[in-house]
């Protein structure tokens, strides 16, 4: 398993580099890329945002392993994960309103403080302290995915008066480097935890200086901005009306809830499946992120002028890949007949599918959901998503260890079959909808500049 993980990592990394280099050579520079003021504003945003993302990714490979290192049972670990998910959904519902009221910069600084405290709780073996840490982690995650982007959009439009058409270029580049940071963070986590031998708590301690630096840079370089005009109840009510009045939105939300709840369960299960077979967790995690990056690169190529595939087709392909991978996992995790290499390949396919899924879903959401209702609709999407994930982990908590993992993959397979049916339903509804298609080869390319 050790050799397989390193070979997969090197192979995936080489594939990603090859695709990105060929794409960069073929793409001419855009007008936004040559604007010094725009590039400076991007740099001010990236230097804080990327530190926050790096600190977040650094903790991912060894979270389950740390709880296992503290001799907690799998059921107890499942409850810790459920606590984190419940915290994320509760704080996520009010995060946008909280950020608007508190201030975007202040919220980013609060993120660095709460996430640092979350990391410090990992030094304790007390179960209650770890539960508090998971709650802080949920708050931090909600702030990470709301405050930073809200701050940048306000600065981009209100302070610098840049064209709104340039905003996707900033976030497309951020998405690419987010994958790169995740790959590097996995290797760094493996280095401090395993190669140096500091143990599974080391990545969490190493994340604290990154969070402190992110908070300090935000305090020094960022201006504050507020938006006190949105009421939480009005936002949610508008989102619910949009969800119930448009069948496309309802089907899209169903697909997102089913697909992403399965991904949350996968995040919990990959460590106990591979760790007993000597897998280097940091390198395995980096391989996952490289596979996801490869999927994103394939998405950009597939939707380019040359191939002109539609996001709806790629969304369907992503769901099919995950269905196939989960069926693989139901066999490769059979008690007494475990095949870690097959499980690892299935996990890589799931991550590849994620690389196709997220940009496809982002494109379709942007086209289907009115901009003024997106925050409210996404709040309603998150509720079933996290509830399904929590229910899955609670079912696993009550299962026998030897058969529980296989049974959970079987349940996830059934969930993804339902997601596939929802995709077919969405296809039926939007098959003649030109709005959900990328521009034709004779028009400007859809993909934002990187």
UniProtKB/Swiss-Prot annotation:
Single GO molecular function: molybdate ion transmembrane transporter activity
A GO BP term here is: monoatomic ion transport
How does this protein sit in the membrane?
Multi-pass membrane protein
Where does this protein reside within or beyond the cell? Answer: Cell membrane
Annotated keywords:
Cell membrane, Ion transport, Membrane, Transmembrane, Transmembrane helix, Transport
Q: Which GO terms describe its cellular component?
A: plasma membrane
Q: Does the keyword Disulfide bond apply?
A: no
Q: Which residues cross the membrane?
A: 1-21, 43-63, 79-99, 128-148, 174-194, 195-215, 249-269, 278-298, 311-331, 344-364, 376-396, 409-429
Pfam families, per database record: MFS_5
Q: Which domain of life is it from?
A: Eukaryota
Describe its function.
Answer: Mediates high-affinity intracellular uptake of the rare oligo-element molybdenum.
Belongs to which family?
Answer: Belongs to the major facilitator superfamily.
Write the protein's name.
Molybdate-anion transporter
- Source organism per entry reads Pongo abelii (Sumatran orangutan)
Its taxonomic placement starts with:
Eukaryota, Metazoa, Chordata, Craniata, Vertebrata
């Amino acid at each position: 398993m050790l050799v397989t993980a390193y070979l997969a990592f090197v192979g995936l990394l080489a594939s990603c580099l090859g695709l990105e280099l060929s794409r960069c050579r073929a793409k001419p520079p855009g007008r936004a890329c040559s604007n010094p003021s725009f590039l400076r504003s991007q740099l001010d945003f990236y230097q804080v945002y990327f530190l926050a993302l790096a600190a977040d990714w650094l903790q991912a490979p060894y979270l389950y392993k740390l709880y296992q290192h503290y001799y907690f049972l799998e059921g107890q670990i499942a409850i810790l994960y459920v606590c984190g998910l419940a915290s994320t959904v509760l704080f996520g519902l009010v995060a946008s309103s909280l950020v608007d009221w508190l201030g975007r910069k202040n919220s980013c600084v609060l993120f660095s403080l709460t996430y640092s405290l979350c990391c410090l709780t990992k030094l304790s073996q007390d179960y209650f302290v770890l539960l508090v840490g998971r709650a802080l982690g949920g708050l931090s995650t909600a702030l990470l995915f709301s405050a930073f982007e809200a701050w940048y959009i306000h600065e981009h439009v209100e302070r610098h008066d840049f064209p709104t058409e340039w905003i996707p270029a900033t976030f497309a580049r951020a998405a690419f480097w987010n994958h790169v940071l995740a790959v590097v963070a996995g290797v760094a986590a493996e280095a401090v935890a395993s190669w140096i031998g500091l143990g599974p708590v080391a990545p969490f301690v190493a994340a604290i200086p990154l969070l402190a630096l992110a908070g300090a840079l935000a305090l020094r370089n960022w201006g504050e901005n507020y938006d006190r005009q949105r009421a939480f109840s009005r936002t949610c009510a508008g989102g619910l009306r949009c969800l119930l009045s448009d069948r496309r939105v309802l089907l899209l939300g169903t697909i997102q809830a089913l697909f992403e709840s399965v991904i949350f369960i996968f995040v919990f299960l990959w460590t106990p499946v591979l760790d007993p077979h000597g897998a280097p967790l940091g390198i395995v995690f980096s391989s996952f992120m490289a596979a996801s990056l490869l999927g994103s690169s394939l998405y950009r190529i597939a939707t380019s002028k040359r191939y002109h595939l539609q996001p709806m087709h790629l969304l369907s392909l992503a769901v099919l890949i995950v269905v196939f991978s989960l069926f693989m996992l139901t066999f490769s995790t059979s008690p007494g007949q475990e095949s870690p290499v097959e499980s690892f390949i299935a996990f890589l396919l799931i991550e590849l599918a994620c690389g196709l899924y997220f940009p496809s879903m982002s494109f379709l959401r942007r086209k289907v959901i009115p901009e003024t209702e997106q925050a409210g609709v996404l709040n309603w999407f998150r509720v079933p998503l996290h509830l399904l994930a929590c229910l899955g982990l609670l079912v696993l908590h009550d299962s026998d260890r030897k058969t529980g993992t296989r049974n959970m993959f079987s349940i996830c397979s059934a969930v993804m079959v339902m997601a596939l049916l929802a995709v077919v339903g969405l296809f039926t509804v939007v098959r003649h909808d030109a709005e959900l298609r990328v521009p034709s080869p004779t028009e400007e390319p859809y993909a934002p500049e990187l």
